[in-house]
Amino acid sequence: MIINFLLNSIVGTVKLDENPNINLKNNINNNDNNKENSIEINDYLQTLVKEEDFKNQHTDPNFKFLALRSTKVPIDEYNPENYQLKFVQIITRHGRRTPESKRYPLTMWTCNSLDQLITNKDTSRPDCNMGQLTVLGIVDQINVGKAYRNLFINNLHFLDNKYNKDQIFIRSSNRERTISSARSFMHGLYGGSFADDQEKSPNHSSFLILDEKDENMYPRSSPKYNFLKGLLKKHKAVIEENEKSNLKEFTEKIKNIFEDSKFDTAFYVPSWRSYAGLVNSFDCFRNNGLPLPKGFTNDVIQRMYEESAKEFKSARLFPEMSILGIGRFVNDLTKQMYLKSVNDPSVKDLKLSLYSGHDTTLAALLVAYDMYEDNVHPVTSSALEYLLFQDKNYKEPEVVTKSNEKELINHQYVKVIFNHKPIHIGPCKDKEVDGMCPLSEFLKISQSIIPTNYDEQSKITDEEKNKYIQEST
């Protein structure tokens, strides 16, 4: 289905400046070891939200709103000397949210209405829903959108200064937090003053949201996928790593932290199925300024994030999990990339595609392309970018045909950036050109991740189960 959202349909309390340009600045970082041009959002933009807009009687009085990741953009990575940026795909994780659990009273978090991203300060704030974007989650995504505005509009002039619906494609999973994140991103990219008189602005963006049964932006249940996921914890490589890292002792340490202070704070998790789930619940408290049990030191928190990343990465032990889990979404991304590369009329004016997803979306893509380089759980507001470049001096054919298509593709390359840091596709590292994967190789690698027949490949026989068990345990 297509859902239309007004780009300027919110009224402001979190008063980002009426001119979306002046909150941003150019910051040239001349480091002796890395002389690289970077763009950085002004510090005050990140803290401009007023405390009364996100704090309540439950908030830790010492909490300060800070970005969860770096906002420095290495502009040289987007503007290499011999290449022209042709197309950008951005896959984001939603901003800070409330828990998806009835265990905690949702009055602890500060949210806005679902219809308006930012609620007028004179209006009483509505109750939060489970899994809803919080006020700070909205500001996170607005800041991300503003960073891209400064990059793609103010510096590279890649996108039009005024919103052009033909240049941008937007898709979101059918969750409030991802839909609101996409809206917030677009407000940062093309928003205005957020004033009452703009509430019925004719500017709008069409969001593609698939029916639940067709959604593929995150791993879905299937007999084979579920079996392999359950088998991972019993895999000899996973058991060996867990024993080597003393995971059992670390898990007991966290349980003791909860038991020792379960009456001090609302955050209490007696048991958990995965560290990814524990980290997500933990972040709902920490990242929104809510008190935590004593004992969650920086070292403990870092280890939790590492264990979550290890869980995600373990899926590489069964390549079929990437094919079944994220392969259909890879197919959607790759088809769009291919059409743009051969100048298909259907994407003639398209320059940027935004996909608003989840931590499981990003982690699955990082694993599938063997480019999960950081040992950390993808934080909220993370962004994964696929950048399509073309040789600047190449004169492309006026009409693309089957006979010249290969030549055109051979002059194009894909660069991957995660949270403004270049990363590298594992199977393409030895074929890179100037730090980029040739498009022809990228398409081959992508094809290896895409299921040929999802329904058939999702099935698993008892004989296959026994074979997997024998080989992995």
UniProtKB/Swiss-Prot annotation:
EC number: 3.1.3.2
Name of the protein in its database record: Probable acid phosphatase DDB_G0284755
Record carries keyword Chaperone: no
Reactions catalysed, as given in the entry: a phosphate monoester + H2O = an alcohol + phosphate
Family statement: Belongs to the histidine acid phosphatase family.
Pfam families per UniProt: His_Phos_2
Superkingdom assignment: Eukaryota
InterPro entries per the UniProt record, alphabetical: Acid_Pase_AS, His_Pase_clade-2, His_PPase_superfam, Histidine_acid_phosphatase
PANTHER family from the UniProt entry: 2-PHOSPHOXYLOSE PHOSPHATASE 1, ACID PHOSPHATASE-RELATED
GO molecular function: acid phosphatase activity; phosphatase activity
Active-site residues, record numbering mapped to chain: 94 (nucleophile), 359 (proton donor)
Keywords: Hydrolase
